[in-house]
Amino acid sequence: MSIEVKGVKKTYGDFSVSLDFSVNKGETLALVGPSGSGKTTALNLISGISAPEEGRIIVDGEDISVLPAWKRNISVVFQDLALFPHLDVGGNIAYGLFIRKIPRKERLRIVEEALGTVRLSGYARRRIDTLSGGERQRVAIARALASKPRALLLDEPFSSLDAPLRKELRREFLEIRSRSDAPCVFVTHDREEAAIVADRIALIAGGRIIETASVREIFSEPKTEFAARFFGAGQVLPCRVLEKRHEGFEVSSPLGILTVMTPSEFNSEKPMIFIPCEGFSFNNLDKAGWKNFNARVTNSIFEGSKLSVKLLLPPWVSGQNQIVNEQISFELAANPREKIPESGGNMDIWIDQSLIRFVR
């Protein structure tokens, strides 16, 4: 089983989407992006709620682009869950099975199996309005899985829950998800949630997929400036490319002269570099490939287990001959034996140049 979205286009007034992506059997793809980027539209097109104007949607080798929603056997968990208040838990889970004319005895067996999967055994006769928020989420997921769907789509299913419950349900979702081979598209605007639930992440903006990669790659090795800034797992800085050397490109940046050792494409008109969080150290590292710089602390906040530090870098002349005063922010693990950097003071930082890469 797999999902392939090929050249799919849809226009709503001034907004249009143009989508190309795929999801493999048993894989969860997190579709991540800012509000209004086209995430929910993508789900509507796959599920059949909306029809594409161009392109093809292929599920398990079959082109389903022209099939009505009820013939696609694709389950959707909506943000508002869309549970039927007049039906009990079992009735909600069995609703799709009833529509498909599955015999009653088989429906009851599937309902009990689905409830066991989401740890709600014995809840079949419970009313929806007696359930907690987390229990309702589990019922919605059980209903989605009961029909053995060809694909599973979730539209920000945990966004209305408080933080501790969201964290708990993310872990449970991973366990539940491991029992199904159906390809899954999980829409969220939460970067942490995407990193936890997904195998790969597709970043969408303006109705277009900007970048698709594994969770580790998109956080630590983004290829685009938009992805680097959106996921915020490092620092994005302007630079001037000075020359190409044997070990890489030498660049001038607000951090000083650096060497970009990892080969990657860059925008020759507006080159940018990305340094992941693990590429910085606040301990004195006199090792090959590491470069030291000094910056002024403009803000330092102790937050219990961590420190939030904002640094003002020395003035730097950009490629457009403009003087740039960049600020960068870090979160550091708080060490009670180390002195907390004070605002107005200076601190030394070391950079692992082997982790620097261009973003376009």
Where are these regions (language model features)?
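Non-catalytic connector elements of ABC transporters
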Residues: 13, 234, 244-360
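The feature captures the beta-strand-to-loop junction immediately N-terminal to the Walker
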Residues: 32-34
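Helix-to-loop junction immediately C-terminal to a conserved catalytic motif
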Residues: 47
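ABC ATPase nucleotide-binding domains
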Residues: 73-75, 79, 86-226
